Amino acid sequence: MWIGVISLFPEMFRAITDYGVTGRAVKNGLLNVQCWSPRDFTHDRHRTVDDRPYGGGPGMLMMVQPLQDAIHEAKNKAGEGTKVIYLSPQGRKLDQQGVSELAANPKMILVCGRYEGIDERLIATEIDEEWSMGDYVLSGGELAAMALIDSVSRFIPGVLGHEASSAEDSFARGLLDCPHYTRPEVLAGMEVPSVLLSGNHAEIRRWRLKQSLGRTWLRRPELLESLALTDEQATLLNEFQREYRVRQHDD
């Protein structure tokens, strides 16, 4: 997968290219992240990249010419048909379904805004899609872009150490993940659930699915509203709910 990034702070993306899962993906040639800074496309000695908004008001906007030239340079590098994405609080909210859709693109260009944003005409002429990390404001698009890169890279074959890992992530099936445990068997007086020590893979699978359903019901019940549960899932969720209510009553 090739990802181009337009950012005033390209050095921030070393967190993606040099570390962790994405860093290994870059090292192994599975992920290529290339950055362009609008500052490199300025023509004044101050390398100006911001400009006043028409109509006045607080704050500045990213200057059109350097940003547009950087986008064009990235497009020329990427080739025809490459999707250009602007990270914006006004965009479609990113969820696992959206990540899966974006991961189907072998190439994409991410535009990271700064200041009060970018000229609306640039959005109309240069941007294909706008995506948001959520209903809150960041100082710039870089952190959002890094989160997007990290999430889509998990879908690249060979990036994860275990191919089943991405399929078992939270939200991969529309559900939150189940609880996980490692050594020691007893921690702060709490024991690892005995089923996980049993070696019975069918029961372990059933327990994990039940816990995943139950955790989603407790913490993100709205996710269940959009799911068509199988008979097994419905049965396990009912079991979890009954057991949970008994525990609450006993407490």
Curated annotation (Swiss-Prot):
Q: Does the keyword tRNA processing apply?
A: yes
InterPro entries given for it?
Answer: Alpha/beta_knot_MTases, tRNA_m1G_MeTrfase_C_sf, tRNA_m1G_MeTrfase_TrmD, tRNA_m1G_MTases_N, tRNA_MeTrfase_TRMD/TRM10
Q: What is its EC number?
A: 2.1.1.228
Might you name a Gene Ontology BP term for this protein?
tRNA N1-guanine methylation
What keywords sit in the KW lines? Cytoplasm, Methyltransferase, S-adenosyl-L-methionine, Transferase, tRNA processing
Q: Which reaction is catalysed here?
A: guanosine(37) in tRNA + S-adenosyl-L-methionine = N(1)-methylguanosine(37) in tRNA + S-adenosyl-L-homocysteine + H(+)
Where in or outside the cell it occurs: the entry states: Cytoplasm
Where is it found, in Gene Ontology cellular component terms?
A: cytosol
Residues binding S-adenosyl-L-methionine are G113, M133, G134, D135, Y136, V137, L138
GO terms for MF:
tRNA (guanine(37)-N1)-methyltransferase activity
Q: Which Pfam family is an annotated match for this chain, by its short name?
A: tRNA_m1G_MT
Q: According to the lineage, what is the superkingdom?
A: Bacteria
Q: What does this protein do?
A: Specifically methylates guanosine-37 in various tRNAs.
Family (UniProt): Belongs to the RNA methyltransferase TrmD family.
HAMAP family this protein is in? TrmD
Subunit structure of this entry? Answer: Homodimer.
Give the protein name, as stated in the record: tRNA (guanine-N(1)-)-methyltransferase
What gene is behind this protein? trmD
